[in-house]
Regions:
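Membrane-embedded beta-strand positions of outer-membrane beta-barrel proteins
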Residues: 11, 25-27, 98-100, 142, ...
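Outer-membrane beta-barrel pore domains and translocons
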Residues: 2, 28-30, 101-103, 133-134, ...
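Extended terminal
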Residues: 1-25, 62-63, 190-203, 237-381
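Outer-membrane beta-barrel translocator/pore domains, especially the C-terminal barrels
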Residues: 33, 153-169, 178-184, 215-217
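Extended, hydrophobic alpha-helical segments in both membrane/secreted and soluble proteins
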Residues: 11, 126-128, 138-144
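Short, surface-exposed coil-to-beta transition loops
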Residues: 113-114, 141, 275-277
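Beta-propeller and related beta-repeat scaffolds in trafficking/envelope systems
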Residues: 1, 37-124, 133-135, 147-150, ...
């Protein structure tokens, strides 16, 4: 039996080659908190970077939360520390082959239950062959490879997460979650360097994600949609609406990472009564977003929250345009009505009305071909 601080180990442990300090082990431990062994300077630098960004973001979040202010700006402060994290010289000398199991393993404040991992290292290349465990009643597994033979460490990793509540992941990092739901994620990434900032700046790869049975807390989508409809109805809203949690059945899409910026070309959100789609970027370097969103009203259209934004048949199939920009902490509260896009919607509706009147005037007096030609005149951009 072995002990490390308050962790008790049992199993086999040995040195296969004393000259090369070749470590071989199969160990089982009750619990281990890896965060306790993070270098103090690195942790202080992380806290300082977080505090600098927080000061900038807090003001934006406070002013934008009501949804009736101008479109928020993206944050500009770096969110990550440039303090070195890995003891590169030590890692180059490692010669190990170990299998570890823990009742609970804490990594970056995340409690992993029934954790198991296999780790091999030789010649400056360290491989995490398999790491898996339970996380907030969901599951995850990961594989990774760290190459420290050169001056700049190169890290590649694949990760799979299933049925993990995303809000618990964010809350563990001390963040207020802008979205809640059960997360499924598959990611394949590559990066280089030896600090948080470097790893984010050089992050490349791809991922697919899906959140089910979730909520957009304090979302103002209803307010923005109602404002757009009221504008076309040429009426003023009686008051401010929204601010309630917006439930969704599924939120999904794919991410393509390029030097720390995640492009999301295919965002889809299924909300009762609404179909939401969009595309945009998430800048992980500053934790900011910039999206174009379209919202289409489906199902029952009789329960809009204000008399000024009642929906009529003319609005069937119309995609209402929103712009969403600002720090990730805002979530859906970063969305505002796209005024330029609304101009195009108004023009389309005006063309539709002209076509309806033309149909009434022409009746059966002219051929279908001529009708189509005349209608086309009004639909040109």
């Amino acid at each position: 039996k072995l002990g490390l601080d308050d962790t008790a180990f049992s199993g086999r442990f040995g040195i296969a080659d004393f000259a090369r300090q070749s470590l071989r082990a199969q160990l089982k431990g009750d619990k281990l908190d890896l965060d306790r062994y993070l270098p103090a300077k690195a942790k202080q630098a992380q806290d300082a970077a977080s505090a600098t960004r927080k000061a900038e973001v807090d003001a934006t979040v406070a002013s934008a939360a009501q949804g009736n202010t101008p479109l928020p700006e993206k944050p500009t402060r770096q969110a990550w520390s440039d303090a070195p994290l890995l003891p590169i010289a030590t890692l180059r000398k490692l010669d190990l082959d170990v299998a570890l199991n823990f009742g609970r393993l804490t990594v970056e404040k995340l409690p992993i239950d029934d954790a198991s991992l296999k780790l091999r290292g030789q010649g400056g290349v360290i491989s995490l062959d398999d790491m898996r465990g339970g996380l907030y009643n969901g599951r995850f597994n990961a594989k990774a490879n760290l190459d420290v033979r050169q001056d700049s460490a190169v890290l590649t990793a694949t990760k799979h997460i299933a049925n993990v509540p995303v809000e618990r992941l964010l809350e563990a990092q001390g963040k207020k979650p802008p979205v809640k739901g059960l997360l499924d994620l598959d990611a394949d990434i590559r990066t280089s360097g030896n600090s948080e900032k470097s790893w984010i700046d050089h992050l490349n790869g791809n991922a697919r994600f899906s959140l089910i049975n979730g909520v957009l807390p304090d979302a103002n989508l209803e307010q923005q949609l109602c404002q757009g409809i009221a504008t076309l109805n040429r009426k003023a809203l009686a008051g401010t609406h929204g601010g309630k949690d917006t439930p969704f059945r599924e939120l999904k899409g794919s991410l393509n990472f390029t030097n720390g910026v995640a492009s999301n070309p295919d965002l889809k959100v299924a909300i009762p009564g609404l179909a939401v789609s969009g595309h945009g970027d998430i800048d992980l370097r500053v934790l900011g977003m910039d999206y174009r969103i379209g919202v289409e009203i489906q199902g029952d259209k009789s329960d809009m929250p204000d008399p000024a934004c009642q929906v009529n048949q003319r609005y069937a199939g119309i995609e209402w345009p929103l712009l969403c920009r600002g720090p990730l902490e805002l979530g859906a509260k970063a969305c505002r009505l796209d005024k330029e896009g609304m101009g195009k919607v108004a023009a389309k509706l005006a063309g539709n009305r002209l076509n309806e009147k033309l149909e009434e005037k022409l009746g059966d007096k002219v051929s279908p071909e001529l009708k189509d030609a005349l209608k086309g005149l009004f639909n040109r951009k």
